[in-house]
């Protein structure tokens, strides 16, 4: 019996997942949609049995989510909740964009101080929740974080060498070893560079497909997010509108998680991710169709009234 030991979290999900971070990312992706059915289940006509099932399922997911010890997943779910707060506050999309730009400028000007604070943090990953959260910003001694920075540095060097078209789709895994620098290596680095990916959904296309790949990949995420918010605001049905919002929240968890890890090449993340993307787009198309139908009906009424 391992109980809830921290070290056991790294392989307790096997054979279904090969990594606890992928497991955490998948749960984070699903929690908002399941929460939707808990909140709006009665409006959807769910009986007592269905509601008990939803509550049980959500409780299991949250328990697994916490015990996954995936720091990136924890951060991503907080970001999704932030989206819910902002949307429910009825803040205009333009305002959000301006605020985001201002934050980017502030971070850019404060980058030296931020990195200095991160470098002073020596708290490693731990079974203690508070210490584990604190280790998120440890870029000096935490092996996982240091190795992540190593992979990112390799990706950026590969991009600098081939900025337009990159080194080719799927080639990062086979080539990054040659781009490793001794001062970037961690205790879990390998000389041959045979252990994986960029740890980023944004830097992988940048290194493999150049600037075009990064822009294309990011555009898909941004457009889907905008469509999700638009679907929420233009859909007349409260239930459909909130389904679009909670599906967008689920996707947001991975948009954020994608800065720190990269799992879309696996079926276990790709299926729920693109499934939620399809839900968001379908609701937006439905809302567009309803709007056009309403316009036609109004035109007919005007013509009839003129007669």
Question: Which residues are covered by each model-predicted region?
Answer:
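Peri-membrane helix termini and adjoining interfacial loops of integral membrane proteins
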Residues: 1-9, 76, 127-130, 182-187
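Alpha-helical transmembrane segments of multi-pass inner-membrane proteins
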Residues: 1-8, 17-90, 94, 98-99, ...
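Long extracytoplasmic/lumenal interhelical loops at the membrane interface
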Residues: 7-9, 14, 139-153, 161, ...
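Membrane-interfacial segments
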Residues: 39-43, 90-91, 118, 122, ...
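Short helix-coil transition/hinge motifs at the ends and kinks of transmembrane helices
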Residues: 41-48, 117-127, 138-139, 182-193, ...
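A juxtamembrane structural motif centered on a specific transmembrane helix
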Residues: 44, 51, 230-245, 251, ...
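A membrane-periplasm/extracellular boundary helix in multi-pass inner-membrane enzymes
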Residues: 67, 88-141, 151-161, 169, ...
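Hydrophobic alpha-helical transmembrane segments
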Residues: 210-224
């Amino acid at each position: 019996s391992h109980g809830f030991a921290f070290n056991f979290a790294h392989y307790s999900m096997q054979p279904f997942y090969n990594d606890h971070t992928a497991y955490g990312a998948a749960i984070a992706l699903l929690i908002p949609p399941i929460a939707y059915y808990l909140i709006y289940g009665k409006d959807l006509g769910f009986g007592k049995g269905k509601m008990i099932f939803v509550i049980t399922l959500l409780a299991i997911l949250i328990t697994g989510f916490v015990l996954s010890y995936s720091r990136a997943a924890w951060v991503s779910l907080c970001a999704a909740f932030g989206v819910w707060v902002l949307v429910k506050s009825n803040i205009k999309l333009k305002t959000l964009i301006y605020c985001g730009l201002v934050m980017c400028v502030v971070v850019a000007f404060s980058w030296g101080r931020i990195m200095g604070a991160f470098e002073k943090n020596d708290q490693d990953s731990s079974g203690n929740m508070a210490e584990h959260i604190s280790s998120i910003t440890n870029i000096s001694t935490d092996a996982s974080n240091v190795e992540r920075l190593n992979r990112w540095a390799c990706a950026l060097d590969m991009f600098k060498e081939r900025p337009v078209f990159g080194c080719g789709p799927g080639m990062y895994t086979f080539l990054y070893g040659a781009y490793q620098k001794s001062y970037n290596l961690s205790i879990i680095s390998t000389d041959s560079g045979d252990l994986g990916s960029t740890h980023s959904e944004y830097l992988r296309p940048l290194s493999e497909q150049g600037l075009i790949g990064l822009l294309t990949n990011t555009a898909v995420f941004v457009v889907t997010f905008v469509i999700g918010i638009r679907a929420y605001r233009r859909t007349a049905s409260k239930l459909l509108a909130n389904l679009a919002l909670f599906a967008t929240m689920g996707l947001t968890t991975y948009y954020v998680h994608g800065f720190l890890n990269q799992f879309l090449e696996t079926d276990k993340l790709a299926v729920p991710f693109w499934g939620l993307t399809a839900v968001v787009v379908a609701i937006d198309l439905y809302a567009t169709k309803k709007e056009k139908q309403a316009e036609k009906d109004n035109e007919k009424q005007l013509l009839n009234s003129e007669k």
